[in-house]
Amino acid sequence: IELLTLVKRRRGPYYLAAGPAVQAGIPHPQNGAGNGPGKEEIPYRFVHYQQDGPIATVTLSRPELSNRVGLEMATELREVCQAVQADENIRLVILTGEGDQFSVGREVLPEDLSGSPASVSLDWLRSIQAASAIAAIQVPVIVAVNGDAMDHGLELAIAGDIRVASSGSKFGLTDLAAGAFPWDGGTQRLPRLVGPAWARDMILTSRIIDATEALAIGLVNRVVDSGRLIEETRTLAESILAGGAIAARYAKEAVSQGADLTLDQGLRLEADLNVL
């Protein structure tokens, strides 16, 4: 019980700035949208949100810029994650990108081109962080990687629980090659996923890897033909939904929090979750 209390304290509320949907008075799913048997969509500018029964599909929607992440997209993405957390009808989330790419990184602004990477303010970098909001979602999150996931795009992808990639996808954290530094969890989540050695390899060399290598090192869980990506992702989602909803949440909790605990502490957490 003490461990559960610690876990809940560490979670805490996730602060979210009001995005355009809230400012415009558009209802969130917890206010009534998405509770019926059909599909419901919540309009945003750069993030598409659709709920189909217990599945929420979140799509990065800036295909003309290969879904690069800017301030408004990041704000909307955090806002959508908050909506998902508040809707008890949602049991699983699918995160993907519109068009041929998942996301190739951060939006390049004129001031970035005229100055050094160091000139980008810390406050601005924090304002476009969104990976922690994805990781904080309590239900399983499947990331359907439809093309390249680079830099900030990869940081968003590895914040999910399971990654299904199209066969032509490529992956990389190339910030160091540009004299920059990962800022949305890349240096922390990547080594926890693939191990410190592979993480150092990718980060220090800015090397780009293909889907086959990503599968071999554990960066993605499955690789499928691009034409079958959504179908395979939905099949995987249905297999997860076939199990118990509460059990799935607790299993995710145990695995996620257990990574930061000793084995004995993790076993106690597992036992405590079993009796809730």
Language model regions located:
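C-terminal long alpha-helix characteristic of the crotonase
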Residues: 3, 10-18, 46, 164-169, ...
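Conserved CoA-thioester-binding segment of acyl-CoA-metabolizing enzymes
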Residues: 10-98
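Terminal peptide-recognition signature
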Residues: 58, 62, 76-77, 95, ...
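Glycine- (often His-adjacent) and acidic-residue-rich active-site loop
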Residues: 89, 97-133, 149, 179, ...
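Short helix- or helix-capping micro-motifs
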Residues: 104-106, 145, 190, 198-207
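Glycine-rich phosphate-binding loop at the start of an alpha helix
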Residues: 124-128, 151, 184, 208, ...
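Glycine-rich beta-to-alpha active-site loop
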Residues: 128-178, 208
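Alpha-helical segments flanking ligand/cofactor-binding loops in enzyme cores
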Residues: 132, 154-155, 188, 200, ...
